[in-house]
From Swiss-Prot:
It is found in: Cytoplasm. SMART domains: DnaJ. The lineage of its organism: Bacteria, Pseudomonadati, Pseudomonadota, Betaproteobacteria, Burkholderiales. This is Chaperone protein DnaJ. It holds the Pfam family DnaJ. The gene is dnaJ. GO terms for biological process: chaperone cofactor-dependent protein refolding; DNA replication; protein refolding; response to heat. It comes from Burkholderia pseudomallei (strain 668).
Amino acid sequence: MAKRDYYEVLGVAKNASDDEIKKAYRKLAMKYHPDRNPDSKDAEEHFKEAKEAYEMLSDGQKRAAYDQYGHAGVDPNVGAAGAQGFGGFADAFGDIFGDIFGQAAGGGRARGGPQVYRGADLRYSMEITLEQAAHGYDTQIRVPSWAACGVCHGSGAKPGTKPETCPTCHGQGTVRMSQGFFSIQQTCPKCHGTGTYIPEPCAHCHGSGKVKETKTLEVKIPAGIDDGMRIRSAGNGEPGINGGPSGDLYVEIHIKPHAVFERDGDDLHCQMPIPFTTAALGGEIEVPTLAGRASFTVPEGTQSGKTFRLRGKGIKGLRSSIAGDLYVHVQVETPVKLTDQQRDLLKQFEKSLAEGGPRHSPQSKSWFDRVKSFFE
């Protein structure tokens, strides 16, 4: 099944700004997050689709490749043999363009030397709580990595032997191919651009010169980070080839849904049930915040759905000098499981309201005025 256009997935125009793309992704992520739709396969697919689209369009280089080449420009399966991670369209033509212009996508070659490639970037997905996002969080992660083989000390050759000059390219890493009037250089098919070959590979690393290991890294998550943001750890991606630089590690942050608060940028929203007596008579109520407790006064006659704004009780974002606000949406709660005495008191109260006329229930009067024509 063909992939949908990434801009179509997020519902934004092709010239959308980074903020518009981020806002569209946040809206879809909140709507389709698996934690909010635990039994919906359809929601899960929508969430994955939106996440993939955001990952591509929020990265300047990937977005440029996608705009020029479409899905082929960012498909990691279209790349040089053995490439992993963030390879793209240009990698598929690395050997050809690198040989002609002296530099491949993500790699280059010193004149007369072997092909040099930058290591692939790695991505690590991390879930944190809203509290950790608001206050900052230091943690450790374990990621797969590569280290020099301890048996051959990184040479790839069996102990007691050593790599030899490639007889096909004579150590150049490239061979010249001629066809008619054209002559181009290509990566040597025997040594794959290294300029050497290993007649007796190391049995431990199978000639690669490296072994897989798990590396522990310190990650400092800054206070105010938002869902979908990435933290870059330079040089902690996959190692380069033939002395090329290592790639980077990107830690992608995902914030778990909160039991009380819903985040909207630097602002927070929460639903607050209050007794109908407090709504009618007014009074002071206490609400939770990420920094502790806060209180505010509910005026007499507060209706269900009324929103109160507590300034500075939200989150201080990464690029903000002040914290956002907390919006408390009150829900007037109807009492249940009444005693006989309570029922009698409410009936007396109801009777006194009726005697007082519509001034006690202005919304009900307005509603009945609008619908009375249906009953005439």
